[in-house]
Amino acid sequence: DVCSSDLQERGIFMENTSEKKDKNSVKKPLKHICIGLVAHVDAGKTTLSEGMLYLSGQIRNMGRVDHGDTFLDNYETERERGITIFSKQAEFIWNDTSITILDTPGHVDFSAEMERVLQVLDCAVLVVSAVDGVQAHTVTLWRLLKQYKIPTMIFVNKMDRQEADREKLLEELKNRFGDGCVEMDMQSEENRESLAMCDETMLEEYLSGGKIEKETVKKAVAARKVFPCWFGSALKAQGIEALMSGLCEYAPSAEPLPEFGAKV
């Protein structure tokens, strides 16, 4: 397990996890979403899942792939090689939402295992390394997400690295995947304008009042007109809370099944 001193060395100064778990467990969740984490190998996908589970209070310590002690990579072969081979499932509550995350293999040799998971997702989080940018396998993943019509959000990881350039990375995402890739910092007028340009309804709302309703954004995400982008560092637990809150606000959730009933 990772001790507190190691977390501090990585720049993580978190509030008490038991308190956070209590805060997110008090209320009964109003909705449930199933999220798949997909990425090219070494983008930091498993570290992101580790951060989500830690911040939501589901695990007491953040493991590391290079230490071989992550929660979801629990097969010996995975820990020895430092890669995910089998898809794994975990659940946590954040705000008013119960979230199931599926951590999928990033290595191209195990793409079939990853693709098998796509059909059950409400939304995908495509993890992109700020160091490597969009890779060939990232493009392959994007095409699969498009083929299965899966609403997609993007988390640009490793922003703590010196060579990471937010503006260049966002420009690359737009060039490769379209103008629907929008950074979800709505404090920025430029970001609000970029979001408004993705959909006529959002543009009308923005022009009439200067703001866009969250439900309107959620519909645009479901229709794959908008691909919300967040930037952070999974290793240092930076940007993860914003991503999780964004999932709660904008990720479409499956319609609940009607209660079964029959006359005998």
What is each model feature region?
Residues 9-264:
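Structural and coupling elements of P-loop NTPases
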Residues 1-4:
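Short, small-residue-biased leader/transition segments that mark boundaries at the very start
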